[in-house]
Amino acid sequence: MAPKADPARRVVADNRKARFHYEITDTVEAGIALTGTEVKSLRGGKATIGEAYAGPSGDEFFLFNAYIPEYLEANRFNHETKRPRRLLLHRRQINKFLGATQREGYTVIPLKIYFNERGRAKVELGLGRGKKLHDKRETAKERDWQRDKARLMRDKG
């Protein structure tokens, strides 16, 4: 059975391929600076972060290429769907990400967008390095073996 979901943490968008394409070494929770129509649209649950990434712009970090659809009930005051969104991080976290991305070849990838128990929109960021093709094959083999092992244990037991 799947583990029970945390009722206080409602996931809006999930980047499921990130863990396949990247070796995630560290995760951090960050806030997102959003407009009112973006929050209302996120509550509808139609956001996409499959092609999104986080990067520096000046001395701040932004979430680029994240798609939040327009809010249908809004009129001319709607938001731009793929605009850069400022991430709310501590200075120490920003410096850590800057060092890792500039020197060590890491990438900052959004893993999830969710609402916390206080109703604030948060993004879970992962610091990761891209996997090579043979690493992806090993990951797929390991996943298949775990599935087969569980199936054998279930059928024998």
From Swiss-Prot:
Give the main location: cytoplasm
- Family according to the record: Belongs to the SmpB family.
Q: Function, please?
A: Required for rescue of stalled ribosomes mediated by trans-translation. Binds to transfer-messenger RNA (tmRNA), required for stable association of tmRNA with ribosomes. tmRNA and SmpB together mimic tRNA shape, replacing the anticodon stem-loop with SmpB. tmRNA is encoded by the ssrA gene; the 2 termini fold to resemble tRNA(Ala) and it encodes a 'tag peptide', a short internal open reading frame. During trans-translation Ala-aminoacylated tmRNA acts like a tRNA, entering the A-site of stalled ribosomes, displacing the stalled mRNA.
Is Cytoplasm found in the keyword set? yes
What's the protein called, per UniProt?
SsrA-binding protein
Annotated region Disordered: the residues are 133-157
Instruction: Provide GO CC annotations from the record.
Output: cytosol
Spans of biased composition, class Basic and acidic residues? 135-157
Q: Where in the cell is it found?
A: Cytoplasm
Entry keyword annotation includes Cytoplasm: yes
Gene Ontology MF, one: RNA binding
Q: Which GO terms describe its biological process?
A: trans-translation
Query: Which organism encodes this protein?
Result: Methylobacterium sp. (strain 4-46)
Give UniProt keywords alphabetically.
Cytoplasm, RNA-binding
Which is one Pfam family of this protein?
Answer: SmpB
